[in-house]
């Protein structure tokens, strides 16, 4: 898988522990509570590997709506410039005329990701670094591309939105140690 890096040797916990970041395990995000956060990325970013992020987002919302009625919040990248926001113009227009229920946009510059995901059911990401932040904070991730660093510890299929397959805690901890 593309999300594997380095020499593939399990690392001890000392580096992780030296950071002082606490991992409390997966949150209990089951049931009817919680929104879905879709993490947009900067259009043309190399980690997208020629994927059109706007088309991916539309396709993702369509696929999710087949399987869930949960609220969906599409989060813009916090580093997008005003000019760069123009790269999402097609996406904004498409959603303005689409009849999707309970889909909103969140400005990633104005809402800190920590606040945005604290009541999330899960984060859906192509290959955004927000996947790592979500896992560290116990929020499940659907990582749809093998280049997503959380691909090996999260769900990988949108159709499983209501029954997420997540890595067991020992695997997640080892993944964190290996980062």
Predicted segments with their positions:
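Leloir-type glycosyltransferase catalytic cores
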Residues: 1-33, 152-179
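Short loop/turn segments at strand-loop or loop-helix junctions that form parts
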Residues: 33-45, 74-79, 145-146
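Structural motif
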Residues: 35, 71, 121-122
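Class I S-adenosyl-L-methionine-dependent methyltransferase catalytic core
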Residues: 44, 50-51, 86, 162-164
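Short catalytic/ligand-binding loop motif for oxyanion handling, primarily in non-cytosolic enzymes
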Residues: 45-48, 80-85, 132-133, 150-153
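Catalytic donor nucleotide-activated moiety binding site of glycosyltransferases and closely related
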Residues: 61-109
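A donor-sugar binding/catalytic signature common to diverse glycosyltransferases
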Residues: 108-155
């Amino acid at each position: 898988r593309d999300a594997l890096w380095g020499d593939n040797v399990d690392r001890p916990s000392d580096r992780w522990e030296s950071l002082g970041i606490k991992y409390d395990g997966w949150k209990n995000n089951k049931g009817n509570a919680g929104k879905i956060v879709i993490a947009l990325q900067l259009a043309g970013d190399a980690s997208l590997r020629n994927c059109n992020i706007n088309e991916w987002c539309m396709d993702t919302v369509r696929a999710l709506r087949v399987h869930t009625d949960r609220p969906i919040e599409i989060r813009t990248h916090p580093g997008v410039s005003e000019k760069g926001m123009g790269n999402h113009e097609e996406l904004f227009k498409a959603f303005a005329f689409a009849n999707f229920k309970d889909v909103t946009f969140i400005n990633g510059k104005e809402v800190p990701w920590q606040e945005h995901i604290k009541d999330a059911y899960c984060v859906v990401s192509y290959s955004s670094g927000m996947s790592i932040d979500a896992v560290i904070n116990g929020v499940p991730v659907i990582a749809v591309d093998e280049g997503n660093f959380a691909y090996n510890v999260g769900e990988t299929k949108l159709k499983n939105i209501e029954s997420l397959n997540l890595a067991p805690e020992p695997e997640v901890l080892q993944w964190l140690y290996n980062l």
